[in-house]
From Swiss-Prot:
It catalyses: N-acetyl-L-glutamate 5-semialdehyde + phosphate + NADP(+) = N-acetyl-L-glutamyl 5-phosphate + NADPH + H(+). Pathway: Amino-acid biosynthesis; L-arginine biosynthesis; N(2)-acetyl-L-ornithine from L-glutamate: step 3/4. This is N-acetyl-gamma-glutamyl-phosphate reductase. It is found in: Cytoplasm. The lineage of its organism: Bacteria, Pseudomonadati, Pseudomonadota, Gammaproteobacteria, Vibrionales. Signal peptide: none annotated. Its EC number is 1.2.1.38.
């Protein structure tokens, strides 16, 4: 049994991870932690997340000595803020822990990226170079071998899963950049209260127009520029991404279908709907990404739907763990 620790356990993604670790036949939950000054320290996770009552009743402790925690852990999930993951990951890695980081701290290898989009200067280029990008369906060999897996972001997961099969097979005219319009539920903003995610203030609206940090993450890992506009929706969880692209000359609907089928054959977390239209309610509280598409002339619209807290975060992190250790991909996820 792998001793598994969750840092940032009080948040939505941390709670989802606690449920999965408890359910996993090869993992044992060795500790739940929050920052030293968190008001949640000392409470049980079931007090913070009622759905875990009589499931996981472990106390959430303040993280005061990460080196000691590392000695008691085989696996560490970091469900923490970007700058916190940046500082903590090397401590656990140097102690020999396998680390799965749900933040953006190790996702993008690009000069100046973290200064520009995350507001801090990256100090650990050696670990940045060693990190595998945790887009589970596309980077399995890297995930199997890396000591650090930087789990893909929520919007980047929904977007890339919709685009990559066509891009890899050379079916797109990339002179016209893919245009991604994606809407996320309010849980994507986290558990901490703010005016932005207040019940009475939430209204469907775009944000981060032309400057959202997920645009360069998507573009770098696709190897293709994109126009990405995120939207905040007035619902709790889920992401729906609608991607408009131009097909290369002469590409047929049959080639499109074949590209998706070949890309995701044997990939149990992706469900292809063909010309059916994905819906958030079909993926909510599941580890799946549903993908559908429509072709008209030289253009294609691909729609993908995920649960932002699961396939966009916690279940993808667990899927990466399963890939890394050779367990069935959906172990503890269904």
């Amino acid at each position: 049994m792998l001793k598994t620790t969750i840092i940032g356990a009080s948040g939505y993604t941390g709670a989802e991870l606690a449920f999965m670790v408890n359910k996993h036949p090869q993992l044992t939950l060795s500790g739940l932690y929050v920052s030293a000054n968190s008001v949640d320290a000392g409470k049980t996770i079931a007090q913070l997340h009622g759905k875990l009552a009589n499931v996981v009743d472990m106390v959430v402790n303040a993280l005061t000595d990460p080196k000691q925690v590392a000695q008691d852990s085989d696996v560490v999930f970091l469900a923490t803020a970007h700058e916190v993951s940046h500082d903590l990951a090397p401590i656990f890695l140097e102690a020999g822990c396998q680390v799965f980081d749900l933040s953006g701290a190790f996702r993008v290898k690009s000069d100046g990226f973290y200064d520009t989009f995350y507001g801090f200067e990256h100090q650990f280029n050696n670990w940045l170079d060693k990190a595998a990008y945790g887009l589970a369906e596309w980077n399995q060999e890297e995930i199997k071998n890396a000591p650090l897996v930087a789990v893909a972001g929520c919007y980047p997961t929904a977007s890339q899963l919709a685009i990559k099969p066509l891009l890899v097979d050379g079916l797109l005219d990339t002179q016209q950049w893919p245009v991604i319009n994606a809407t996320s539920g309010v849980s994507g903003a986290g558990r901490k209260a703010s005016m932005t995610n207040s019940f009475c203030e939430v209204s469907l609206q775009p944000y981060g127009v032309f400057n959202h940090r997920h645009q360069p993450e998507i573009a770098q890992h696709l190897g293709c520029d994109v126009i990405f506009t995120p939207h905040l929706g007035n619902f709790k969880r889920g992401i729906l991404a609608t991607v408009t692209m131009k097909l290369a000359q002469g590409v047929t609907e049959q080639q499109v279908a074949q590209a998706f089928e070949q890309a995701y054959q044997g990939k149990p977390a992706v469900r292809l709907k063909g010309d059916g239209i994905p819906r958030i309610q079909d993926v909510e509280n599941t580890p799946f990404c549903d993908i559908g598409w429509k072709v008209q002339g030289e253009h294609i619209i691909v729609i993908s739907a995920i649960d932002n807290l699961l396939k966009g975060a916690s279940s993808q992190a667990m899927q990466c763990l399963n890939i890394h250790y050779g367990y069935p991909e959906l172990t503890a996820l269904l």
